[in-house]
C-alpha cells in the first residue's frame, strides 16, 4: 500500500504522476495505475477551476513518429480515465511528446538513480554512455506521464 499526494502545480512546472503504468508498447493503462489516477481525480474535484495538460513521454526506442503516436495514445488513455471519473473533458488536454522532451534529472530522480547528477538530461546520446543496467533505469524514467496546470479560471467567466 502506498499514498499518493499531488501538490497543485505551479502553472509553469509539470508534475510527474507517479505509478502510471502502461502495457508494453501499448496505450492501455494497467490496473496498478488506478490509485494514482483516482488521486488526480480527487485533486481536480477539489480544484474545479483548474484545467490541465496530460503529457505522456517515451524513451528513445522506436522511431520518432511511432513514439509520438504511442505517447499521444497514452495521454488520451489517461484523459479517458479521468473523464470516466467525472472530470469534464473541457478541463483536460492530452499531449504526446514522444521522446522529444527527455527528463531533466532533479533531486527526486536521484532517489532511484543515484548514479546520475542533478541537471543531467536523459537524451539518447547521454543514456548510451551508461552501463546497460543504468540505460534501462534511465529509459524507464523517460517513460512517464505528467500533468501541468494550464489555467485556474475554468468556469469562472461564463
Predicted feature locations:
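Periplasmic OmpA-like peptidoglycan-binding domain that tethers envelope proteins to the cell wall
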Residues: 57-158
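Periplasmic peptidoglycan-binding/tethering modules of Gram-negative envelope proteins
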Residues: 1-51, 90, 108, 112-113, ...
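Conserved phosphate/oxyanion-binding catalytic-loop motifs
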Residues: 54
